[in-house]
Amino acid sequence: LYSLHIMILPALIIVLIGVHLMMVIIHKHTHYSGPGRTDDNVVGYPLMPVYVAKAGGFFFLVFGVVAAIAATFTINPIWNYGPYDPSPVSAGTQPDWYIGWLDGALRLAPSGWDISIFGYVIPMGVMVPLIVSLLFLALVAAYPFIENWVTKDKREHHVLDRPRNAPTRTAIGAAGVTFYAVLWAGASTDLIATNFQMSLNQVLVAMQIMLLVGPGIAYFVTKRACIALQNKDREVVL
C-alpha cells in the first residue's frame, strides 16, 4: 500500500491530467450560450497570455498559502501523542468527509440480514450497502451514455444548458444529490441523536425513510420548478 500511495497513484493522477488536457484539445471547451457561440466554435480569451497568467497567479497564491501554513502551524504533532492507544478514542468520532456517505450506508442498512450458505455467513448488512454504493457510482458514470442512448442524440454539445431548460436531467441530478446527502448525513446519526436529545433508533428510521422517499420528492419538486421557470421565461418573452 505504501508503494501504491507514493508511486502508482501519483503516476495515475499525472496520466489522467494528460488525458484530460488531450480531451480538452480534441473536444474543446464548453461555454455559456450567447451571441456567436455555437457547438462548433470556442469563444473567449486565448490560452496565451490570459489563461496562463490566471493559472500561474492561482498557483503562486496556493503555493504561498501552503508555505505560510507549513512555516507557522503545527499539524499532527505525533511526538506529543505518545504510543498509540485506541482506548481514549471518543464515541463521537466521525469519518472523513469523502468517506462519510459510505459510513452512512453501513449505518442505515437494516440489521439481521445475514445469510448462511453452505456453512458460510454472508453479512448482508455489509454487502447490501457495498452493492448499492457501487451501483450508485456506476449510474453516475454511465448517465451521459444512458441519456445519449435514450435521446438518440449523437451530436457533440459544447454550449451549456440552463438547468431549467433540461428539467429531467436537472431533476435526476437533484435526486442523486439527495441520495448522497442522506447517506452522508447518516454517518452522523449518533451525533444528531445526542445533540438533539433524540432516540438513535428514531433518527435511523427517519434517515432510512428519507433515503427511500427523498430522491423521489427531490426529482418531482425540481422538475416542476424547472418547468415553472420555463413557463415564466415564456411569459416574459411573449
Predicted features and spans:
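Membrane-embedded and interfacial regions of multi-pass energy-transducing membrane proteins
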Residues: 1-238
